[in-house]
Amino acid sequence: HDYISGIHHHGAHQGEYVTHHDHPVTIDAVHGARILDSRGYPTVRVSLELDDGRTVTGDAPAGASTGAHEAVELRDGGSAFGGRDVTQALHLIDTDISGLLTGRSWSAIGQIDAALAELDGTTGYRRLGANSVVATSIAASRALAHAADLPLWQWIAEITGSTPRMPVPHFNVLNGGAHAANELDFQEFMIAPVNAGSMADAVRIGADVYHALAALVRDRFGSLGLGDEGG
């Protein structure tokens, strides 16, 4: 869900992007769909049909907790999925966002993000929903990467002027706060194997630490509770 707060600032800093690598893309159709996240709650998927026949998608991440300054997800309320359904967001994707994006040539992600922010017209995406906007922006990024004939990671590196590197996996090994029924003040205790020799080695280190920690907790407290994010 941190990505949703990040998208609020994306268009405002479009001047930071290197645009000479961008290739224009024309979007023929925009569709919203409901998918389920890892907790079994709905989130938003946006599909963009491009004029060359390619379809790209973007999925909005969602979290159990929301920061005070985080952009606002659009949820239905009511009884379906505990009030977390996204039919309103899907309707706005299929109507307002589709009307904005289709039939035009787009050449930069900052251009698209700024247009989405203007269409929304509120602070924190309260009208369209940050879940609608971030899924659209992710799909649009994939569309522009496709137009440039680049994998997404390389396209991001080129427009930001950054040097690609393998990510370091982060493991959430203990949960507290809103993520667990305990008295821990910290919501997430995470480890990152920064000096691992490879991604496979980093994953092994994370798994070894997780299971060793579980054994210590079981020995000391007699049982294990499973937090909202697996810790």
Regions found by a protein language model. Name each.
Residues 42-44, 48-74, 88-91, 222:
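N-terminal glycine-rich anion-binding loops that anchor highly charged ligand groups
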Residues 64-150, 159, 203:
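Metal- or metallocofactor-binding catalytic centers and their adjacent structured scaffolds
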Residues 19-43:
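Short, Gly/Pro- and small/polar-rich lid/capping loops
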Residues 36-46, 124-145, 168-184, 228-231:
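Conserved phosphate/anionic-ligand binding catalytic regions in large, soluble enzymes, centered on
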Residues 164-225:
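Mobile "lid/hinge" segments at catalytic clefts and subdomain interfaces of large enzymes
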Residues 106-112, 130, 152-155, 214-231:
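Flexible, glycine/charged-enriched surface loops at secondary-structure junctions
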